[in-house]
């Protein structure tokens, strides 16, 4: 049995009225639902693709204006924290949109991870629909109030030691750290990376790990522990 969509309830939650309600219905239609009900003309996948770009643009613009002195690297990593699946899941929860998702009975959403993915995709699809129907302005008006305030965003930048080190060297020395990765093997012979971090040509820290990303974090953490008295 196909389900009906309470368009007015969703529009009330979004504070946006669709000129073309079919866009909203498409945004709510999970691919698994269309598989069970072929009469559903289109599923949400294309709108998800568009909505992902809309979300990224709005969040990028918001951070750009909110933090005028922030460099590109920190802007990028902070944006990533605000547009990932977990963040989008939280935004969907805030708007209570999940209950409107049209999803097939056979689709597994028992796991928390499955629910996060489905709800994140739903948010992106709805943003894509809003953008097509009304442009960027209403999409912005939906997204920005969902974002953390400035004081809550700041810690997101500093969770990663690489971000903290970059902020520290820029503030104190007006330079960026550089990383050099070398092949490395652990005691059991597993391949990995030996990463060195340099500031002004001086070696500040080293890290050893199975992945280059983790080795860079460890090197940055060591650099902070020896050069930043606040850490």
Swiss-Prot record:
Biological process according to GO: mRNA processing; regulation of gene expression; RNA processing; rRNA processing; tRNA processing
GO cellular component terms listed in the entry, alphabetical order: cytosol
Residue stretches in coiled coil: none
Subcellular location per the Swiss-Prot or TrEMBL entry: Cytoplasm
Chief location bin: cytoplasm
Cofactor names: Mg(2+)
Active site: 52, 124
GO molecular function terms attached to this record: double-stranded RNA binding; metal ion binding; ribonuclease III activity; rRNA binding
Keywords noted in UniProt: Cytoplasm, Endonuclease, Hydrolase, Magnesium, Metal-binding, mRNA processing, Nuclease, RNA-binding, rRNA processing, rRNA-binding, tRNA processing
Positions of Mg(2+) binding: 48, 121, 124
Assembly behavior: Homodimer.
Family according to the record: Belongs to the ribonuclease III family.
Protein name per the record: Ribonuclease 3
Lineage: Bacteria, Pseudomonadati, Chlamydiota, Chlamydiia, Chlamydiales
């Amino acid at each position: 049995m196909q389900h009906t969509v309470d368009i007015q309830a969703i529009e009330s939650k979004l504070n946006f009225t669709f000129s073309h309600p079919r866009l909203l219905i498409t945004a709510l239609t999970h691919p698994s639902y269309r598989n069970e009900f072929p009469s559903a003309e289109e599923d949400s996948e294309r709108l998800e693709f568009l909505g992902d770009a809309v979300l990224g643009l709005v969040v990028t613009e918001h951070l750009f204006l909110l933090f005028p002195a922030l460099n590109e690297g920190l802007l990028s990593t902070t944006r990533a924290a605000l547009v990932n699946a977990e963040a989008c899941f939280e935004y969907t929860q805030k708007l209570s949109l999940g209950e409107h998702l049209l999803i097939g009975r056979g689709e597994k959403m028992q796991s928390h991870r499955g629910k996060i993915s489905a709800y994140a995709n739903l948010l992106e699809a709805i943003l894509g629909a809003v953008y097509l129907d009304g442009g960027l302005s209403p999409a912005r008006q939906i997204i920005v109030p969902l974002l953390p305030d400035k004081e809550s965003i700041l810690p997101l930048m500093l969770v990663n030691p690489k971000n903290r080190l970059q902020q520290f060297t820029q503030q104190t020395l007006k330079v960026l750290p550089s990383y050099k990765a070398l092949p490395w093997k652990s005691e059991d012979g597993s391949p990995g990376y030996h990463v060195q971090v340099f500031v002004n040509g001086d070696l500040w820290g080293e890290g050893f790990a199975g992945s280059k990303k983790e080795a860079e974090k460890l090197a940055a953490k060591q650099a902070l522990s020896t050069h930043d008295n606040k850490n």
